[in-house]
């Protein structure tokens, strides 16, 4: 996760990102340790306290498309798509429901389908390189 963009997000945008991440985590009805770790890490990087995150996780009826439409800055939209792709792929199981949320949010922000594919490929390549590096360096990530 490249954190430079975080400094440019408003507090409202940070909450929007977290709401969408929580919808994505719940999409496949199987919340993995990697996904929880991602949420904790990103919330800390966004400067959002745990109580706020817990409150967001407990929200049942988040309209993620309406939330995504609030992101009007192109750079922020692309960063959100990237982070969503990381989160959706982090458990090595990209479910159809997760993919649907990524696509619906991206489209709501005006991100082209071709750009979504390119971002997802880049994220997958990065994840593969990271895992390969861990194997080469004999790093136990377990």
What are the residue ranges of the model-derived segments?
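Small-residue-enriched hydrophobic alpha-helices in membranes
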Residues: 1-25, 30-142
